[in-house]
UniProtKB/Swiss-Prot annotation:
Pathway: Energy metabolism; oxidative phosphorylation. InterPro entries: Cyt_c_oxidase_su8, Cyt_c_oxidase_su8_sf. GO terms for cellular component: mitochondrial inner membrane; mitochondrion; respiratory chain complex IV. It comes from the Eukaryota. The keyword Ribonucleoprotein does not apply. The chain crosses the membrane at residues 37-60. Its main location: mitochondrion. Residues 1-25 form a transit peptide. The keyword ATP-binding does not apply. One of its GO terms (biological process) is mitochondrial electron transport, cytochrome c to oxygen. In response to mitochondrial stress, the precursor protein is ubiquitinated by the SIFI complex in the cytoplasm before mitochondrial import, leading to its degradation. Within the SIFI complex, UBR4 initiates ubiquitin chain that are further elongated or branched by KCMF1. This is Cytochrome c oxidase subunit 8A, mitochondrial. It comes from Pan troglodytes. Residues 26-36 are mitochondrial matrix.
């Protein structure tokens, strides 16, 4: 590394340290109506089918996906 490399890097990052970081203005209200059992069941089932079912299929059929040696 060159002798000037730390000076160049310090010059590049020095101005970024002085920039103010804006805070997010997130305000939320309470829900208008509570979720029922049916909505929760449909939501959890759709998450399971979307994410876990394909991963389980691939893991259970891993031997068929491997290349023959």
């Amino acid at each position: 590394m060159s002798v000037l490399t730390p000076l160049l890097l310090r010059g590049l990052t020095g101005s970024a340290r002085r920039l103010p970081v804006p805070r997010a203005k997130i305000h939320s209200l309470p829900p208008e109506e509570k979720l029922g059992i049916m909505e929760l069941a449909v939501g959890l089932t759709s998450c399971f089918v979307t994410f876990l079912l394909p991963a389980g299929w691939i893991l259970s059929h891993l031997e068929t996906y491997r290349r023959p040696e």
